[in-house]
Amino acid sequence: MKQLLAGFMLLSFTACYQGNTKSEDGYKTALSFAPGEESKIEAALLSLTDSTRITLKEGTYKFDNLSIAQLKHILIEGAGAGKTVLDFSSQSQGGEGIRVTDVKGFTINGMTLKDSKGDLIKINKSEQVVIADLHAIWSVADSTSGGYAIYPVMCKNVLIENCYAEGASDAGIYVGQTDSAIVRKCKAYKNVAGCEIENTSHAEVYDNEFYGNTAGFLVFDLPDLSKKGGYVKAYNNYLHDNNERNFAKSGSFGSTWGVGNAAPGSGIVILAASNIELYNNRIINNNSNAISVVSGFFIDENAAAKMNDNYFPIPRNIHIHDNVMQMDTAFPAAVYEHHTGKVLVGIEQQLNAMDPSRKNARIPFIAYDGITTNVLTKGTAVNPDSLCIQQSGPNLFVNINAMQMKDKGWKPSTDITPYVCK
């Protein structure tokens, strides 16, 4: 734990240094451009040298795509989100709006990116990355939108701060296969997932607002990737009204592990991720489920065959405490057309059929698939994977007993006793 805290202190210091460098003497080269000089900007990026500050003045710039690679100490700054706008709507080639690869010390802040065909900004294999005061938006939120609005992947030491993402057909703010990341004071609206932490270790997500998405916040570990995630904390977030239709691209549905599996009305979903702590969050009016904790087996019966050093399908060491959770009186309409959504509806119906005293109560706030390491070890231990819940109130928890869902005698259980923190 001391090493973890020290790492985050170092990240915070590094991030503040990179993001707050304002004087030109912090960079060997300072370049400044205005709208209408797009060709000069593209040429400058092709010949960019280490330690360069690029200032984009207020106005709208139209680009096909921009690329930066194999550099150190680079700053791209605008006049502010909504003031400096990079418009990729006429893009004729390239997937991303901005692609950054192998840059050590990269900061981008103070601008809006909009309407690329693929991801709006993808930062790959880079270190000491700061994305601040950035809006990343698609004008139309549907399956034609790019997958990720803000997308650092395979990076180290990432700070995403005071950003806004809208319209992504996968995740508005996504951090993938990264070591050490902070997402704070951001907003995500009208995406499939507001924010996703995937196969990422040592991440903190706090003081954010994720609302009006299909699902508010996802913590996923997926197979066949180069890095194992874990040690993720999410706290002081406001996740509300995430009830919208899942408009992920078709290849993201079913057993292909994509975000298409996220049911409309999901607040937080933990999938096959371990060492996770959720606390002091307000999880309000996500009307299918506040928190779901599920294994890889929940969406792929062959998950065991995918196990290796970077992937273990059972979530372990999950600590849920001191969250405020509320749901409305009914599922969102979109849930009835979604494959995972139909499962959640079935759980609620089965609980109420089993126990008329529930008087048609809603599905409990926390849903656990109940698939444990016992399926791998043939053991019989109760709560062998340390799901630890410290929450109070009625209708709090359901163990879905997902392995028996297809059986006639299937009985989900609302007994939280084995999972109350000792």
Segments (PLM) and residue ranges:
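Right-handed parallel beta-helix
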Residues: 73, 77-83, 104-115, 127-140, ...
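Right-handed parallel beta-helix/beta-spiral solenoid domain characteristic of secreted/periplasmic
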Residues: 21, 27-39, 53, 73-117, ...
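Acidic, glycine- and Ser/Thr-rich low-complexity intrinsically disordered tracts
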Residues: 299, 303-313, 321-422
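C-terminal motif of bacterial Sec signal peptides marking the signal peptidase cleavage site
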Residues: 14-15
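Extracellular beta-strand/beta-solenoid scaffold signature
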Residues: 41, 88-99, 115-122, 143-152, ...
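Sec-dependent signal peptide recognition
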Residues: 1-7
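Short, T/G/N/S-enriched strand-turn elements that build extracellular solenoid repeat scaffolds
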Residues: 41-47, 62-70, 76, 87, ...
